[in-house]
Regions:
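Non-ligating segments of multi-cofactor redox enzymes
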Residues: 1-145
Length: 145
């Protein structure tokens, strides 16, 4: 039904791995588009950093001809997403209009079931209320809860 509304189209993001330099510009863009707050150094040390895209680094070749390869890992917008049915308050659900996985932040009660069920480990729990200092609050996306 959702694919009928979208003419059979599904959303995804394509990355040319031969051109990826690991610069993390995609991570910054994702934070800006989805109102994800920047994590402090302390949060990163505690393993509580908010990031929806992570960049995996792999080494290829042997010394002295070693090359770093980067693999961005992000939400795959699964058609039958394992993160959706486990949420007891339906904070994680599949939009039938856009055919994408959506999370309603202010509905989340923090069970973290969605993060535990995500095979790509991109669902995270926001441990603190998001804080955007001036002038960062001016850039928030009004279409995101």
């Amino acid at each position: 039904m959702a694919e009928e509304r979208n003419n059979g189209h599904k959303w995804t993001m394509i990355v040319d791995l031969d051109k990826c330099t690991g610069c993390q510009a995609c991570v910054v863009a994702c934070h800006a588009e989805n109102n994800v707050p920047v994590s402090s150094e302390d949060e990163v040390i505690r393993g509580r950093a908010n990031h929806w895209i992570r960049i995996e680094r792999y080494w290829e070749g042997e010394y002295p001809n070693v090359k770093a390869r980067f693999l961005p890992v992000f939400c795959q917008q699964c058609g039958n997403a394992p993160c959706e049915p486990v949420c007891p308050v339906y904070a994680s659900y599949h939009s039938t209009e856009e055919n994408i996985n959506i999370q309603v932040y202010n509905r989340c009660v923090g069970t973290r079931y969605c993060g535990n069920n995500c095979p790509y480990r991109v669902r995270i729990f926001n441990y603190w209320a998001p804080r955007f200092d001036e002038p960062l609050e001016q850039q928030l996306n009004p279409d995101v809860t």
